[in-house]
From Swiss-Prot:
Homotetramer. The active site is at residues 137, 165. It catalyses: aceneuramate = aldehydo-N-acetyl-D-mannosamine + pyruvate. Disulfide bonds: none annotated. Aceneuramate binds at residues 48-49, 167, 189, 191-192, 208. The keyword DNA-binding does not apply. It is an enzyme of class 4 (lyase). GO terms for biological process: carbohydrate metabolic process; N-acetylneuraminate catabolic process. Its EC number is 4.1.3.3. It comes from Staphylococcus aureus (strain JH9). Gene3D superfamilies: Aldolase class I. This is N-acetylneuraminate lyase. It is found in: Cytoplasm. Pathway: Amino-sugar metabolism; N-acetylneuraminate degradation; D-fructose 6-phosphate from N-acetylneuraminate: step 1/5.
Length: 293
């Protein structure tokens, strides 16, 4: 790897206007908030939290460009370029690489029942076309794709596949991956399981709630790495109270409302997602006050 990619990342939120267009100024504010206020190490751009799969190619490029402009070279940047259209994934990968992103990431192809060989070659094709490092995005609950330890071994044999964003509750597989590949990067993708993932030896984490709860996540990560498990768990309990409440109100509109409370122009979610339900306003205000969000 050209840059040490260990650490904590915001899965960058993207603000939209009423017509579903990207609010560039708001996006810059959200990116800067993640780095300057939440004190995170980097941004994971155009992932699920960016509502990526609702965007067209030009909007995805726009998000890559604006996020890069917002934070420059001072932080780590990972570009999620995965797409069912391999040509789009390659086009996005080339664009992000030209912008100076430190690594690419790509969700496994989904919807159709692809063979492992097809999935493997999808990654190899993106790498060949871009010559950038690749982080596998494993999120089987949404893709239906479960990668075995033997298949991870085949993927990791490629020198440019440097790691995995592991968003799965299978901690046995996580332990097996960590033991088998001590030099590969493992970034946890479940905010609500950060303490468990850290104990299992991950190198960092990527989270949507880190856009508003990154400092608490940092404390969890550091305490768990230092062996202060009871203290880390107490903070994880607090984080999970936040996460549970946010999920109950709709994750993307609620996170954007918390950012709006900070005078950030966080915009709307993209349709068909609904905007924040004002019936939840009192619950949200209480959450912000209780946990200093």
């Amino acid at each position: 790897m050209n840059k040490d990619l260990k650490g904590l990342y915001a899965a960058l939120l993207v603000p939209f206007d009423e017509n579903g267009q990207v609010n560039e100024q708001g996006l810059k504010q959200i990116a800067q908030n993640a780095i300057e206020t939440e004190e995170l190490d980097g941004l994971y751009v155009n992932g699920s939290s960016g509502e990526n799969f609702l965007l067209n190619t030009e909007q995805k490029k726009q998000v890559f460009k604006v996020a890069k402009e917002a934070v420059g070279d001072k932080v780590k940047l990972i570009a999620q370029v995965g797409s069912l259209d391999l040509n789009e994934a390659i086009e996005l990968g080339k664009y992000a690489t030209e912008l100076g992103y430190d690594a690419l990431s790509a969700v496994t192809p989904f919807y159709y029942p692809f063979t492992f060989e097809e999935i493997r070659d999808y990654y190899f094709d993106i790498i060949e076309a871009t010559q950038n490092n690749m982080i596998i995005y494993a999120i089987p609950d949404l893709t239906g794709v479960n990668i075995s330890i033997e298949q991870f071994s085949e993927l990791f044999n490629h020198e440019k596949i440097v790691g995995v964003k592991y968003t799965a509750p299978n901690f046995f597989l996580l332990e097996r991956i960590r033991k088998a590949f001590p030099d590969k990067l493992i970034l946890s993708g479940f905010d609500e399981m950060l303490v468990q993932a850290t104990i299992s030896g991950v190198d960092g984490a990527i989270g949507s709630t880190y856009n508003v709860n990154g400092r608490r996540a940092r404390k969890i990560f550091d305490l768990a790495r230092q062996g202060q498990i009871q203290e880390a768990y107490q903070l994880q309990h607090d984080s999970n109270d936040i996460i549970e409440t946010v999920l109950s109100m709709g994750i993307y509109p609620t996170l954007k409302e918390i950012l709006r409370h900070r005078d950030i122009d966080a915009g709307l979610p993209k349709r068909p997602f609904k905007p924040f339900n004002e019936a939840h306003r009192q619950t949200l205000d209480q959450l912000i006050a209780k946990y200093d969000l």
